[in-house]
């Protein structure tokens, strides 16, 4: 009896230890999500570098500047310049700005870009309301000026402006025709997002989202032509007109908002703000001058998310990131996977710092606030959180931090997620840290090298018929396909034993991607990853 009691007690202790370990593991996962994005800039309220205290005081007295009316909506970066846009209201002295290294009481001071002359808008010659911006690969800054002021009242025609970032000179300005900028049926229009597809300097397509008119506008810079598309996938879903962020709710009726262009597939991803859906259109359809609007194919799913999504961006290897509204976080999905709920993961989640991610941008080799350079070729994400629920409800506490620009290395964000595994597979990244956390002692960095494992001294040249000099074992020379089945007895490393079928990274991986030789543990057609670690299960459950 005593022995049985001891056994029960011991089993109870063991189970308690296992349960405790599981809880601690989940806590660590939540902690990682909360700190995935690092704060780069933050503001209690927005202020400007007016050049002098006298100039600032005069702006306040005249009503030109009111710190309670300045709300940021977009961010982008080029070299050492971080751009921030502010929707134009009374009290907003400049809509397009750069962050300076000067500090004010509310946070870093902003300076108009390119200078104060463009901040004057009364005669419509300057920048009225630069809602969204984009930097392209030719060092050009594209600015979408909605022409709206004071809660979206029309003042000037909407327009596209293009700046040469190397000289800060305006190189082009094009007005968007009225019949393109508004819905012909409802007469409504509010241009809120853009995505730039720069094939070359004279062949660039710009896509613009009209959230109020529920349309998608296309601009071709070669001939300054505009086209407007309509689709029911642009319309808001009446089931989801109520948004709740950090316990605070508001109601709006907005259609298509966040859009993002994939550099891999040329798919344009989008969703209405008031929707749980995610859609895309293959922009290759528009390269045919004879395309017909009625024949444009739109793909996607109506209820693939469990919350509304805002800002969007796609990495160079086809990973789409979305700002989640109700979850106060960022999700990802790899476009090489089937577009379904099970394909998503959460890469960041923080109820305080990630409230309303209205903008996300990805760039390479970003100096973080001019201080740190990422390794060559790495991608870096910037995200803007602006607590839009408080903008709508007009209940800011300007003693709190309200606006943040956050950043993270893209590979770090995706580590231990489904997106990371597929991302590294397509990038040819040999970092097995994203593939199998249990294999800590294996030499995985060269696992994708099909013809050589020089670190082990075992050269596998397909065309050699008799040569296996490194291990002196000539038992089975398979001369036709160069697949030498040598045990590699010198180092006991069997990673290179079978070129056709073996997963070379550890010898213990269960997912043999035999057809394409891509040994990164994921068969893209098999969504049930047998080696998914606890972090991944924890992430994916948040979207269900």
Curated annotation (Swiss-Prot):
Top-level lineage group: Eukaryota
Cellular compartments annotated: Secreted
Family matches, as Gene3D superfamilies: TolB, C-terminal domain
Glycoprotein as UniProt keyword: yes
pH dependence: Optimum pH for protein stability is 4.5. Protein becomes unstable at pH above 10.0.
Compositional bias per record (Low complexity), positions renumbered to this chain: 424-460, 468-510, 518-530
Stored Pfam families: MRJP
Expression triggers: Significantly down-regulated by the ecdysteroid 20-hydroxyecdysone (ecdysterone or 20E).
InterPro entries according to UniProt: 6-blade_b-propeller_TolB-like (IPR011042), Royal_jelly/protein_yellow (IPR017996)
Signal peptide residues on this chain, from the entry's feature table: 1-20
Gene Ontology molecular function, alphabetical: double-stranded RNA binding; single-stranded RNA binding
Glycosylation sites: 183
Homology family: Belongs to the major royal jelly protein family.
Functional summary from the UniProt entry: Abundant protein component of royal jelly, a substance produced in the hypopharyngeal gland containing proteins, free amino acids, fatty acids, sugars and other nutrients, which is fed to developing larvae by worker nurse bees. Major royal jelly proteins (MRJPs) are high in essential amino acids and probably have a nutritional function in larval food. All larvae are fed some royal jelly (also known as worker jelly) early in their development but it forms the principal source of nutrition for larvae destined to become queen bees.
UniProt name for this protein: Major royal jelly protein 3
Organism phylogeny: Eukaryota, Metazoa, Ecdysozoa, Arthropoda, Hexapoda
Gene that produces this protein: Mrjp3
């Amino acid at each position: 009896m005593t022995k049985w009691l001891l056994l029960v007690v011991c089993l109870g202790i063991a189970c308690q230890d296992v349960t405790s370990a599981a809880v601690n593991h989940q806590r660590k996962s939540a902690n990682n999500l909360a700190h995935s994005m690092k704060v780069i800039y933050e503001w209690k309220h927005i202020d400007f570098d007016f050049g002098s205290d006298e100039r600032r005081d005069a702006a306040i007295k005249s009503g030109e500047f009111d710190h309670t009316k300045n709300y940021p909506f977009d961010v982008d970066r080029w070299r050492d310049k971080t751009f921030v846009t502010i929707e134009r209201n009374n009290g907003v002295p400049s809509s397009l700005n750069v962050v300076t290294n000067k500090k004010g009481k509310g946070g870093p001071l902003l300076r108009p870009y390119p200078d104060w002359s463009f901040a004057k808008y009364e005669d419509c010659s300057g920048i009225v309301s630069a809602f969204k911006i984009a930097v392209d690969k030719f060092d050009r800054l594209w600015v979408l000026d909605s022409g709206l002021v004071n809660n979206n009242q029309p003042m000037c025609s909407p327009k596209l402006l293009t700046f040469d970032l190397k000289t800060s000179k305006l190189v082009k300005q094009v007005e968007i025709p009225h019949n393109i900028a508004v819905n012909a049926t409802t007469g409504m229009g509010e241009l809120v997002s853009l995505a730039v597809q720069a094939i070359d300097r004279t062949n660039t397509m710009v896509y613009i989202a009209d959230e109020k008119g529920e349309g998608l506008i296309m601009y071709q810079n070669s001939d300054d032509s505009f086209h407007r598309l309509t689709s029911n996938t642009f319309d808001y879903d009446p089931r989801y007109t109520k948004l709740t962020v950090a316990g605070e709710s508001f109601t709006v009726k907005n259609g298509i908002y966040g859009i993002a262009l994939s550099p891999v597939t040329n798919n344009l991803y989008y969703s209405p703000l008031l929707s749980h859906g995610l859609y895309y259109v293959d922009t290759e359809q528009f390269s045919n001058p004879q395309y017909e609007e009625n024949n444009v194919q739109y793909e996607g799913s109506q209820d693939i998310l469990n919350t509304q999504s805002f800002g969007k961006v796609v990495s160079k290897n086809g990973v789409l990131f979305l700002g989640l509204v109700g979850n106060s976080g960022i999700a990802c999905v790899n476009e090489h996977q089937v577009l379904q709920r099970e394909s998503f993961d959460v890469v960041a989640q923080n109820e305080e710092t990630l409230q309303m991610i209205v903008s996300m941008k990805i760039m390479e080799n970003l100096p973080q606030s001019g201080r740190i350079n990422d390794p060559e070729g790495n991608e870096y994400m910037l995200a803007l959180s602006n607590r839009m629920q408080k903008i709508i409800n007009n209940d800011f506490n300007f003693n709190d931090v309200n606006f943040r620009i956050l950043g993270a290395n893209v590979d770090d964000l995706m580590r231990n997620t489904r997106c990371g595994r597929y991302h590294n597979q397509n990038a040819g990244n040999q970092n097995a840290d994203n593939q199998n956390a249990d294999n800590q002692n294996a030499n995985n960095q060269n696992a994708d090298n099909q013809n050589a494992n020089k670190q082990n001294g075992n050269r596998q040249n397909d065309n050699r018929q008799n040569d296996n000099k490194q291990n002196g074992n000539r038992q089975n020379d398979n001369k036709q396909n160069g697949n030498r089945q040598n045990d590699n007895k010198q180092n006991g490393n069997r990673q290179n034993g079978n070129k056709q079928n073996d997963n070379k990274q550890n010898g213990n991986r269960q997912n043999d991607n035999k057809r394409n030789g891509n040994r990164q543990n994921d068969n893209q057609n098999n969504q049930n990853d047998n080696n998914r670690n606890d972090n991944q299960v924890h992430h994916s459950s948040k979207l269900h």
